[in-house]
Amino acid sequence: MRDKQRVIEHIRQAFRDTERPGDAFLQGSHEGREPGESVAPFMGVADWSQLAPVILDASYTALSFFSEGGFRYFLPAYLLADLEERLQTADPVFQLTNGFSDKKVTLPAGSCVYEKTIGKSAFVNPQRYGAMTWHDHARCQLSVFTREEAGAIAAYLEYKRDAGRHGLNAEEINATLDGFWRDRAANGPTQQAVREHLKEEAECLRDIGGNNG
């Protein structure tokens, strides 16, 4: 089993320079009141490491309503609080593993029993998103993390798997590690690559603006 303190330090180091989106870009969904209410406690918070676990746990639904950038920035606060066993409701493991394995559930309907597939191969909402599955959705959302951040997340998931009682979540965690996180940690874009891209974009825009002047 991985040493918990090493995993905690791994997370701190991997996310120490992660860019924070502006407040206007923290919220992903704008349907109804719940997304805005869920994300509101994070508005104006300039440093994820300063968030108290009690606030994180009370704001557990924010994990579902953050934008990709907001999720990336504030996730490490949830991971550390979870490793320190300070969360009662928030479940970062689910957010990092959902969409990589299938489950069958049976739903009684009168004299019939309806079998439904949930997870990886299930459609998100065909009327709105066509053939997009939860696997497609998960890979899109989680691709926001750099190679270094993905490595820290993989270490967290491995620790949670090994420390879990009675093997709870082990199957889902292994499916996610094999299907996404280990590859992302080995081959994903690095933090340096992202920084260089942003620098080049800024220089290009500055040059274009200068030429137009």
Listing of model-derived features with the role each one plays in the protein:
Residues 108-213:
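Intrinsically disordered, low-complexity, charge-dense segments enriched in Lys/Arg
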